[in-house]
Amino acid sequence: ARAWAVNAHGPARLARIAAENNLTLVHLSTDYVFDGDTDRPYTEDDPVAPLNVYGASKAAGEVAAQTAPRHYVVRTSWVVGEGRNFVDTMRGLAERDIRPQVVHDQKGRPTFASELAKGIRHLLTTQPEYGIYHLTGAGDEVGFDELAMAVYTGLHRDPDMVQPVTSERYFDGKAHARRPSISTLSTAKIEATGFVPQNWRVGLA
């Protein structure tokens, strides 16, 4: 219920306020609106097919946000910023020389919060066509294990300390929400407006 209140009902209220006051609504969404059953990066035109409650509530929020005449729905993935996140967790483990088990069969691209902010500012200042835009870090698609290895390498630790495992093995016996196996989002649409995201490996360095 909380997920729907925050991710669906909240955007609906904001969309009404934006419409009534002729404001531009920026709504952040997620790769979790997709099911991961793809062999290429997702485009903005691909149909949504969420696997869990969070993804379903975010998909509903997208629909609600688009009722505002002036809107930018920004889908992103694997966000890295202040506070707790995957990269920060891996850095902590690397600094303690811990050998973590990390899933290798969930793939995507990290997005640094600073780059996300730059992309949103670009949309608001250049005002391209309203709609949905994908905004993630540029660069190669990686599994969480490969991202962890990049973190270990950056801290001068042996990347082989990271132990790749399947999601099935990692979550064996643990309660967890289903996640898309492929989370890679195509950024061609926002790039066509003049914003080219930074390679995530540059941001990680």
Regions found by a protein language model. Name each.
Residues 1-26:
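NAD(P)-cofactor binding segment of oxidoreductase domains
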Residues 63-108, 113-117, 121:
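NAD(P)-dependent short-chain dehydrogenase/reductase
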Residues 25-30, 35, 74-76:
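SDR active-site strand-loop-helix element
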Residues 31-51:
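Active-site "gating" loop of Rossmann-like NAD(P)-dependent oxidoreductase/epimerase domains
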Residues 178-205:
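C-terminal amphipathic/interface module of NAD(P)-dependent oxidoreductases
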Residues 102-107, 133-141, 192:
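Glycine-rich Rossmann NAD(P)(H)-binding loop
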Residues 48-72:
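Active-site Tyr-X1-5-Lys
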Residues 119, 126-174:
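Mid/C-terminal beta-alpha module of Rossmann-like enzyme folds, strongest
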